[in-house]
Amino acid sequence: MTIKLYLIRHGIAADREDYANDDDRPLTSKGRKRTTKVAKQLRDRGLHFDHILTSPLVRARETAAILQEVGLGEQLDEFPSLAPDGDINTWVNWLEQWRQNRNRENCLALVGHQPDLGNWAELLVWGEAQEKLVLKKAGVIGLNLKETGVPLGRSELFLLTSPKWLI
């Protein structure tokens, strides 16, 4: 059985110049509405996440909370490596532990930032990041991961969509 991994970029956030610290930027009203619409579409298509990991930045945490609020998953944890410039290898190590401890769970969501999520997808599929995959705000990348072994360069891309195709 493969593991389904969904990489979800945070929704539209407040302007940088309005916040002294980029980490503190929340979703805008439009970002919240659009993200909620995307989340409901994913839910209505039968998706459910066994575990949601999110960047600790406010806009990503708010996006992950929306996923949880619409019923896409119950288990939600912050994961520091999903912050900008985070290390995929830290997540790969987490994944190995998760695989060993799970009970038939096979669907994960990671909420983070661009270009990081696009780069992570490239690393998982092709084994190298070239910043070619662009993920729009509230966009989704879907990957199939092998059941065992390091997923880098061994995963399959099955979805890359912007929110406009989901709402």
What are these language model-derived features?
Residues 2-82, 86, 131, 135-137:
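Active-site-proximal alpha-helix that buttresses catalytic centers in soluble enzyme cores
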